[in-house]
Amino acid sequence: MDKLFWIGFVGAVVAGLFAVLQAKKVMGYSEGTEKMQKLAASIREGANAYLKRQYTTVLKVFAIVFVVLLVIAFASGGKMLSKFTPFAFITGGIWSMLAGLVGMKIATSSNARTAQAASESLNKGLRVAFSSGSVMGFTVVGLGMLDITIWFFLLRYAFGIDDPVQLGNIMVMNGMGASFMALFARVGGGIYTKAADVGADLVGKVEAGIPEDDPRNPATIADNVGDNVGDVAGMGADLYESYVGSILATFALSAVGGYGFAGMLLPMALAVVGIICSIIGSFLVKTKENASQQALLKSLRTGTYTAAILAAVLAAPLCFLLLGKAGWGVYVAILCGLIGGCAIGYFTEYYTSDTYKPTQELAAASETGSATIIIGGISLGLKSTLTSILIVAAAVLISYFAAGGSKTIVDGAGHFTEAFNKGLYGIGIAGVGMLSTLGITLATDAYGPVADNAGGIAEMAGLPEEVRERTDALDSLGNTTAATGKGFAIGSASLTALALLVSYVNIVQDNTEEILNFTLTSPTVLVGLFIGAMLTFVFSAFTMSAVQRAAQSIVVEVRRQFKEIPGIMEYKADPDYAQCVSLCTQGALHEMVAPALLAIIVPLVTGLILGPTGVVGLLGGVSVTGFAMAVFMSNAGGAWDNAKKYIEGGHHGGKGSEQHKAAVVGDTVGDPFKDTSGPSLNILIKLCSTVSIVFSGLILAFHLI
């Protein structure tokens, strides 16, 4: 059975080839006028410069962590930490970095091409931007499959590890590098993009009264660079980590659940099927000229829903062939993941799209000023957690019992029963099911920043108003699809985090003869819960204040240029775009390290003081509060953004009105919500889990309590 894992290579090759074909297709389109090409080159140059400095900084941190892991692994003779983990940490980080880099390269080559295509038709603009997003989506899933398959064959055949439990426990540790890189990319990119966005909007729109992406705004280029480093490179690393993490967590649970190599093969096979279904669905994304937002949403839904339905149909024979009769219960769990993912996507769309009542009512709140629209957005975000949490709760319960879980959790020796582990395997495979069609889901997400950049280039290049109207329609759709993509990532993170938590407990129990109390009656578990809950809020505070400080420097700089460079407002002098790009780069690199290190230091210190039971409490606390906070922030931010777009479309006074200025203030509050703190939380949840698993041996050996 284990020899069938070569299908992972097949999935990687298919995804890679499709990504290359889509990239060639995009590069075949015209990049527009000379001015459009120069603007695109400036954005590309700024994005490349930032990523070069970010990766240089991150690699230094990676080197330090690698040495620490290496010392622990070899000094303990592999007892505290597998000798493979330090090297898997490096490869996971490199693949995650590469996923973001490839996505950003194609995005910065597609923005002007999308603007030029939009000058011809709305459908052509949609196709170019979506094809660019497809490169990102299929690169992520292809690299993920390649990484997992290479490590499986190395461990199984090169090093002769034939025990599924041992192999699964080693493999689950491999996700730490990807999670670590993803957190740096998301936090750093999020700080950059939102500092530029907030600074550009507050001074440009509110104070100077000039349109979005106006060439007179010194922060315009930095804003467009930020779309790429945060919403493309950061998101690519983020979802690569989510994809790989969900599969690896299921690997570990398959072994202890008694499914062996067959249970490990299932998530791989499901991922390959998802790649093929995503390719089919991508060909169905198209629209008519002058399409409404509802019609544009329908075009993307057609592709994503078709892929999900095909994956659901093909998953049934996979489950039966690999797991026999037990496969039918696992199939129900996969359906829970697929349906849950689509349901989260729908309700995210409902709360954030301006075609629905919640965002329209939020836009109406601008009639009474910025305070009421901010209050309304917070209320909307808080309310939106209800549906997401209920969907995930239902998916957890149904998948657990369908896969063979029971109410009896532990046996007489205090270890988890096989039935409990089978149920947890069901929850893990539900997470894989939710992300199985990530190729097309991520394509619809990565398309958004490209459309946003295209609108900026159209404005700065002085293209006709009808072109800007088309790019605005695509941009507004992108805001909704971005929120939907974040919903998928957050939902899958909650399922994966639960699977990783149980993997941690299993690994701890396998390495100690002590009977540990992991229930709420343990004071260390309770204290850990409080620390985990606190970590969510402190981490969010770190990322929000980082954006605040970086945005303040941009606001001061833009005001200075308007004041000290005569002729900017009359188009007689060019702003100093490079200075704003430099400030954003410095701010993001300086501010991203502290939040990222929290995810490593807090679980490790908690474990060394409170022991393994305290870590379980921490993981439970950060998972629950982090999930709810991430949904709240992402949906509130998306709604504020689209409420502003709704007003710019001619409602409630339109562009330049007092209502519009109030909506811009709401949007600037929502920017770090939806693009920095919110999406970073789902990485925090999983990184805490993988860090705890990696350092479980050290914690067992040296804890105080």
Residue locations for each model-derived region?
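Hydrophobic packing and interface segments
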Residues: 1-705
